[in-house]
């Protein structure tokens, strides 16, 4: 039973480490989204802070905004996909934790049954010893 429990614990730790990796990926995507937003704001601030803005720069800003919007949408899609993966992994972790708890309870129950059986056996031996002693004392 101990080997089974240890195997389930190892499996649970493995699932937990996979969840941590999933969450790291989510944080990485969120970081890329934040960096893109900061870059976009900095470029727009820099351009709009100029006294005179050439028409070509406005055209370039428009193209940049389109590309940045497309990239942000792609990152948001990736973020949702990664969050879904993390939720699925979180469910696997919960199932693994439940299996560990179940095996622990089974082990405890088996120990209680063993202890109770050992106690009954000890009582029977004590009763037999008492009866044997009592029988010897009252025969003679």
Where are these regions (language model features)?
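Charge-rich amphipathic alpha-helical interaction elements
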Residues: 1-140
């Amino acid at each position: 039973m101990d080997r089974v429990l240890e195997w389930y614990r190892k499996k649970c730790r493995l699932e937990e480490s996979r969840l941590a990796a999933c969450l790291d990926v989510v944080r990485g995507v969120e970081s890329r989204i934040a960096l893109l937003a900061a870059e976009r704001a900095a470029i727009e601030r820099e351009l709009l802070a100029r006294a005179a803005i050439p028409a070509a720069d406005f055209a370039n800003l428009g193209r940049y905004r389109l590309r940045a919007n497309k990239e942000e949408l792609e990152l948001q899609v990736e973020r949702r996909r990664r969050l879904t993966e993390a939720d699925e992994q979180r469910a696997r972790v919960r199932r693994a934790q439940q299996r560990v708890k179940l095996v622990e309870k089974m082990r405890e129950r088996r120990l209680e049954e063993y202890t109770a059986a050992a106690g009954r056996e000890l009582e029977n031996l004590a009763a037999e010893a008492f009866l044997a002693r009592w029988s010897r004392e009252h025969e003679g």
